[in-house]
Amino acid sequence: MANLKDIQRQIKSVSNTQKTTRAMKLVSTAKLRRAEELAKRSRLYAAKMNQVIAEIAGRIRCNKVGGIDNRCFSKIEDPKTVDIIFVTADKGLCGGFNIQTIKAVKKLLSEYKAKNVKVRLRGIGKKGVEFFKYNEVELFDSVSNLSSKPDKEKSDEFILSSIEDFKDGKIDALYLVYNGYKNMITQELHVSKIFPVDATLYECDEPEKSMLEVEAQDEEKMLDSLVNRYAQYAMYYSLIDSVAAEHSARMQAMDTATNNAKEMVKSLNVQFNKARQAAITTELIEIISGVESMK
């Protein structure tokens, strides 16, 4: 049976770990509340942006012969080069949060590799970047400290090169992969095709009440301008959504760790009591034996 001092040392160590995980859970809970509110507001803006683009694209598709003359809305049958931007956390201790994104990226890589399509992998977040570098997967470029602290200007700059390369025909598709926030206990994986814009986003039906007053001759020019903002905001929103999901995942992971530590302390206390009882029993036997031998 383990030495009493060793067991006491283990109890102290696990108890200290329990205090740490409990504190981390409380910190993540506080951060989650702020991140959740920001994600909700950002989601409304993103939805409105999609609505505006859908309406303008729908108008052009309905009214112009030949449809939309914009590569961002054109169906590309045989892509030769694809950009995949992924978002992971800069830190760990958040359960399977990062690995879900990594698995989705690996799946996309395998699918395009099987079709002999060149993939340019662009990473945001230290954990994902380190994983692919460790596994000798080439990264086109990467950045850290952006997923933990979303910055609109840096986010816009990061995705802008992919937007321009798509418009110039250097790439044929742009994907965004990240783990987003669904609720306090659930994260939702997103694999979004940013370009070409999904045709289901816009329909030919005229809206009952338009939110826009745009002259027909200006619609394509406005659409081209808005499509940049659409992609840039999709990038920025993914960072905000990912932060909320990260705090949610870490809160759950630390809650589980705290509960496990609590159970381990209970188990060690039982083990300690048994060891102490055994030691007392041994001492009593030795005393009784000594007394008996003196008779």
Curated annotation (Swiss-Prot):
It is a peripheral membrane protein. The keyword Ion transport applies. Keywords: ATP synthesis, Cell inner membrane, Cell membrane, CF(1), Hydrogen ion transport, Ion transport, Membrane, Transport. GO terms for biological process: proton motive force-driven plasma membrane ATP synthesis. Pfam families: ATP-synt. GO terms for cellular component: plasma membrane; proton-transporting ATP synthase complex. GO terms for molecular function: ATP binding; proton-transporting ATP synthase activity, rotational mechanism. It is found in: Cell inner membrane. Produces ATP from ADP in the presence of a proton gradient across the membrane. The gamma chain is believed to be important in regulating ATPase activity and the flow of protons through the CF(0) complex. Belongs to the ATPase gamma chain family. F-type ATPases have 2 components, CF(1) - the catalytic core - and CF(0) - the membrane proton channel. CF(1) has five subunits: alpha(3), beta(3), gamma(1), delta(1), epsilon(1). CF(0) has three main subunits: a, b and c. HAMAP family: ATP_synth_gamma_bact. This is ATP synthase gamma chain. The lineage of its organism: Bacteria, Pseudomonadati, Campylobacterota, Epsilonproteobacteria, Campylobacterales.
